[in-house]
């Protein structure tokens, strides 16, 4: 297949949300004196992360609104300790999100891959991340010059994996489905979403997870593997 257009996910495909997000949470833990609730950061992290993953899955499927996600993910870990004020969680979320914009660690091989791809393809970001932080993260981490446009779910009015998100990106990038491939780490949002939109997929799967229900067009365990495909 000859591709001309690359739709690329941002978080945990290019921008290292696991490392950067963990750093921000550890700063929050110390600055907000969370040792009063959890003796160690690891204990707090192990409570926060499962809830955060669950809420993001609900957000992707349109089951909750952004406002519910950003409040509940910070309120849930401290609710057992009598903290129930949504405005407190909102302030904490705003602080956390601002901190993420200053983190610049990328997935290993990101810039080398983008340097290789830039002369050959038109590249676009497709992300469910929040508008107020994604543009800053992209710019501060040096990714902006590589991409023709950045497509966010908030601008499209729907999230990956919904087909409307992919249709929005195709239309606004003047791209054809059969000349486009989606690159991402999320099975549900990126890979299943692209397949359901009749777009080929490259699954970035560093954890060697099993596919669910179908075989993606391509699978790689590191970003360097994409150079063998494109």
List each language-model region with its residue ranges:
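Asp-based, Mg2+/Mn2+-dependent phosphohydrolase catalytic module
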Residues: 1-6, 19, 111, 115, ...
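N-terminal helical cap/lid subdomain that shapes the substrate entry/recognition surface
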Residues: 2-108
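Structured helix-beta-strand junction loops
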Residues: 51, 119-120
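A generic structural signal for short
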Residues: 62-63, 102, 123, 154, ...
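Glycine-centered short loops/turns at secondary-structure junctions
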Residues: 120-121, 198
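Conserved phosphate-coupling serine/threonine residues in phosphotransfer and NTP-handling enzymes
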Residues: 127
């Amino acid at each position: 297949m000859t591709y001309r257009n690359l739709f690329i996910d941002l978080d945990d495909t290019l921008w290292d949300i696991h490392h950067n997000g963990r750093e921000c949470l550890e700063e929050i833990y110390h600055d907000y004196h969370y040792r009063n609730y959890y003796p160690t950061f690891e204990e707090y992290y192990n409570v926060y992360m499962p809830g955060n993953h669950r809420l993001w899955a609900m957000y992707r499927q349109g089951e909750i609104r952004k406002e519910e996600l950003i409040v509940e993910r910070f309120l849930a870990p401290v609710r057992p300790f009598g903290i129930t004020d949504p405005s407190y969680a909102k302030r904490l979320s705003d602080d956390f999100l601002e901190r993420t914009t200053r983190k610049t660690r990328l997935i290993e091989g990101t810039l080398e891959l983008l340097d290789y791809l830039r002369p050959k393809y038109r590249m676009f970001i497709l992300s469910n991340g929040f508008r107020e932080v994604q543009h800053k993260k992209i710019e501060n981490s040096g990714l902006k010059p590589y991409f023709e446009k950045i497509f966010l779910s908030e601008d499209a009015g729907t999230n990956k994996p919904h087909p409307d998100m992919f249709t929005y990106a195709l239309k606004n990038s003047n791209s054809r489905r059969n000349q486009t491939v989606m690159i991402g780490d999320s099975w549900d949002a990126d890979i299943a979403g692209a397949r359901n939109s009749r777009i080929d997929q490259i699954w970035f799967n560093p954890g060697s997870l099993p596919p669910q229900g179908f075989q993606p067009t391509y699978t790689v365990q590191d970003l360097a593997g994409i150079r063998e495909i494109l």
